[in-house]
Amino acid sequence: MPHAEKGLTVGLFGGSFNPPHAGHALVAEIALRRLALDQLWWMVTPGNPLKSTRELAPLAERLQLSEQIARNPKIKVTAFEAAHHVRYTADTLALVKARNPGVDFVWIMGADSLRDFHRWQRWREIVLTFPIAVIDRPGATLSFLSSVVAKTFDYARIDEGDAPLLARMRAPAWTFIHGPRSSLSSSAIRKMAKG
């Protein structure tokens, strides 16, 4: 797990990154800038419990490719979930919080992930524990509004203009961040690679 000093603001950007691409790097850069973060931990997960592992590239390969794409020195690429045998995001976030007292974290996710977020194990616990930044993705700008999470926690949504304050806010708190979007997707890249 990367190190963060007390008082820092750190974004947590997790995913299978199968494969990582410039769109992921764009999300990371937008989050760093718009949330005024000191660091961003790019967390390459061993696998997504909601997705098939049939086409999942080896973790070492996804980790190496992520390091090549994430060039900003504020971005720390890690696969600590595998070392700690953590499978679910709620467990990962609990571990991160327990090991880093005094650090202000914000969970970062693409708007496309918000659609199914209510299917994640202990999703309410995640929302009630960590501020969340939802970054715009092509085709997901409007659908996020109808998501279970957006409806359930509409009262906790903060204005996008207040995004730099999010990491220091007490959960539940979340925002939707508009910005440049990349049409790249890992599933489309895998499909093209198959021919």
UniProtKB/Swiss-Prot annotation:
One of its GO terms (molecular function) is ATP binding. Catalyzes the reversible adenylation of nicotinate mononucleotide (NaMN) to nicotinic acid adenine dinucleotide (NaAD). It comes from the Bacteria. Keywords: ATP-binding, NAD, Nucleotide-binding, Nucleotidyltransferase, Pyridine nucleotide biosynthesis, Transferase. It is an enzyme of class 2 (transferase). GO terms for biological process: NAD biosynthetic process. This is Probable nicotinate-nucleotide adenylyltransferase. The lineage of its organism: Bacteria, Pseudomonadati, Pseudomonadota, Alphaproteobacteria, Hyphomicrobiales. NCBIfam families: nicotinate (nicotinamide) nucleotide adenylyltransferase, PRK00071.2-2, PRK00071.2-4. PANTHER family: NICOTINATE-NUCLEOTIDE ADENYLYLTRANSFERASE-RELATED (PTHR39321), PHOSPHOPANTETHEINE ADENYLYLTRANSFERASE (PTHR39321:SF3). Belongs to the NadD family.
